[in-house]
Amino acid sequence: MELPRLENVDLSGKRVFLRVDFNVPVENGKVTDKTRIEKTLPTIELLIKKGARIIIASHLGRPKGQVNPEFSLAPVVETFQSLVKSKVYFSKTVIGEDAIKLSKELKNGEILVIENVRFHKEEEENDPGFSKKLAALADIYVNDAFGAAHRAHSSTEGIARLLPAYAGLLMHKEILELSALLHKPARPFVAIIGGSKVSTKIKVLTNLFDKVNHLLIGGGMAYTFLKSRAIPIGNSLVEKEFEVQAFQLIEKAGVAGIDLQLPVDHIIGDQFNEKAKTKSVDKMGILDGWMGMDIGSKTVSNYEKIIKNAGTIFWNGPMGVFEMDKFASGTMAIAKAVAKSKAKTVVGGGDSIAAINKARVADKITHISTGGGASLEFMEGRKLPGVEALKKKTSE
């Protein structure tokens, strides 16, 4: 997939509208995880070096089209300022005369961050008038927000049709790494899919089916698969309406010669909190009144053997309720096994990234994808509006 590149474009003195994904966790007015900000710094540094005047736009949370101080980018700007050498200004408005004036006053290499684009309901409606007002802030558009590329919004799609548009360095890297997984993975290709719901992962499981050699399933979604095979799951999370599809996937894997593995033992709890009593149970199933909260040691051992011999690994979704220390050991063990593997490793999804960081092995992973929903949709084989809008520019 060829996307228009920034590297050879003369940007000196040009106002560049840079869409980034600064949708980071903020607690008590402080950013608690800078990963997404840091990932886009190479693009920002390239623009500074080229003498561009940079207008940065992002969303934060879901303010539902209204100005809400809780979702202001102000604390994010504070963190961002400490990561770049250039002068950084903050516009309390997104569009209009004040924002345009600030954008025109920028000197080469300086940065203006505009307020949360989702403070305007027109952003998520991809309203043409709003896209035009965003385009008035700049001469050139660059999209480096892979994490929002699956949304057809004004700042990710609409504006790209109004200005010369390019992909940022992070956007390129994401597309390159994820495309390689789908088209030419080193074998054996192992996909580790976890998380709480089958409903959110069924499409990616289906698309990966004819590409992987091993499919390792964990997290809350595993219990829908186990229930479909009449294994007792007690009070564990289950999506009844997906039992048939789960059963069909197991059958299909058998026919296709894909090694689909489910947990053979579990760490269970009598309630969904840190105070829960815990037990370890094996394949006989989970007792009534108890719920599966993590994969057990036999499952970890089974999965580790497969991970050790992999050529390529894609991991999306934790193996259990890893936010609670009592139920984190399965996810932590898998994180460490993936990090230790000699395979090319790609990890996507907020929870999996948090697990990798918690296990302190982020530096051992080949590629950490910043796009949760976007990387899943890409792995489902779907077209991403934010990427398609950039491609259109090259063919026009």
Swiss-Prot record:
Kindly tell me the pathway this chain contributes to: Carbohydrate degradation; glycolysis; pyruvate from D-glyceraldehyde 3-phosphate: step 2/5
A Gene Ontology molecular function term for this protein is: ATP binding
The record lists substrate as bound by D21, F22, N23, R36, H59, L60, G61, R62, R118, R151
| Cysteines joined through disulfide linkages | none
Identify the domain of life: Bacteria
Q: Keyword set for this entry?
A: ATP-binding, Cytoplasm, Glycolysis, Kinase, Nucleotide-binding, Transferase
Key word Cytoplasm present in the record?
yes
Return the InterPro entries for the record.
Phosphoglycerate_kinase, Phosphoglycerate_kinase_CS, Phosphoglycerate_kinase_N, Phosphoglycerate_kinase_sf
Write out the residues that bind ATP: K201, G292, E323, G349, G350, D351, S352
- Cite the EC number: 2.7.2.3
Catalytic function, reaction form: (2R)-3-phosphoglycerate + ATP = (2R)-3-phospho-glyceroyl phosphate + ADP
Q: Top-level EC class, please?
A: transferase
Q: Which GO terms describe its cellular component?
A: cytosol
GO BP term, pick one: glycolytic process
Kindly give the Gene3D superfamilies that the UniProt entry links to this protein.
Answer: Phosphoglycerate kinase, N-terminal domain
Q: Where in the cell is it found?
A: Cytoplasm
Family statement drawn from the similarity comment of this UniProt entry: Belongs to the phosphoglycerate kinase family.
Q: How does it assemble?
A: Monomer.
Question: What is this protein's name?
Answer: Phosphoglycerate kinase
What is the scientific name of the source organism? Leptospira interrogans serogroup Icterohaemorrhagiae serovar copenhageni (strain Fiocruz L1-130)
Name the gene for this chain.
Answer: pgk
